[in-house]
Amino acid sequence: MIEELHQEVSDRGFLLTSADKLVNWGRSMSMWPMTFGLACCAVEMMNAGASRYDLDRFGVVFRGSPRQSDVIIVAGTLTNKMAPALRKVYDQMPEPRYVISMGSCANGGGYYHYSYSVVRGCDRILPVDVYIPGCPPTAEAVMYGIMQLQKKINREGQVYSGWRKRV
């Protein structure tokens, strides 16, 4: 009975899917990241956006304004002086918002881990969704991290589950 109804509706040209899947697909295939390049990892992020790797084919369009972005890519060494600025930029982004931590320095302090002026991982300031390892990570690793975030967005259960309150 259900299969017959599904076939009849499909034959008439209607699309049957849940709103969650449709909205999550749209979100995952049109990510607009805000770049927060702090060190040498930013060069690899620019390389990933150039013509050889072309992140545009994944729906990734880099934005210069946090109000137009839904993803922030933190690339490089985060210092104590820069941490409040990063948090302010993150707070200006509309919900749902996601964070990618790119490189060893952003993930855990990296080479400068024991320095008094370095934050030992941007996850102490922001809730990180995807970590991209490497020093600096390759453009392929950046692409893989973006694809992992797309998978994570597609797995979200409800339309509003991405609008979770973050501290």
From Swiss-Prot:
PANTHER family listed in its UniProt record: NADH DEHYDROGENASE (PTHR11995), NADH DEHYDROGENASE [UBIQUINONE] IRON-SULFUR PROTEIN 7, MITOCHONDRIAL (PTHR11995:SF14)
Family according to the record: Belongs to the complex I 20 kDa subunit family.
Cofactor(s) the protein needs: [4Fe-4S] cluster
Gene name of the record: nuoB
Biological role stated in the UniProt entry: NDH-1 shuttles electrons from NADH, via FMN and iron-sulfur (Fe-S) centers, to quinones in the respiratory chain. The immediate electron acceptor for the enzyme in this species is believed to be ubiquinone. Couples the redox reaction to proton translocation (for every two electrons transferred, four hydrogen ions are translocated across the cytoplasmic membrane), and thus conserves the redox energy in a proton gradient.
Quaternary structure and interacting proteins, as annotated: NDH-1 is composed of 14 different subunits. Subunits NuoB, C, D, E, F, and G constitute the peripheral sector of the complex.
Bound cofactor: record note: Binds 1 [4Fe-4S] cluster.
Gene Ontology biological process: aerobic respiration; electron transport coupled proton transport
Superkingdom of the organism of origin: Bacteria
EC number(s) reported in the record: 7.1.1.-
Subcellular location: Cell inner membrane
Gene3D superfamilies xref list: 3.40.50.12280
Protein name in the entry: NADH-quinone oxidoreductase subunit B
Binding site for [4Fe-4S] cluster: C40, C41, C105, C135
Reaction it catalyzes: a quinone + NADH + 5 H(+)(in) = a quinol + NAD(+) + 4 H(+)(out)
Pfam families (alphabetical): Oxidored_q6
HAMAP family given in the database record: NDH1_NuoB
GO MF terms, alphabetically ordered: 4 iron, 4 sulfur cluster binding; iron ion binding; NADH dehydrogenase (ubiquinone) activity; NADH:ubiquinone reductase (non-electrogenic) activity; quinone binding
Topology versus the membrane: Peripheral membrane protein
Keywords: 4Fe-4S, Cell inner membrane, Cell membrane, Iron, Iron-sulfur, Membrane, Metal-binding, NAD, Quinone, Translocase, Transport, Ubiquinone
GO annotations of cellular component type: plasma membrane; respiratory chain complex I
Enzyme class at the top of the EC tree: translocase
Residues in the signal sequence: none
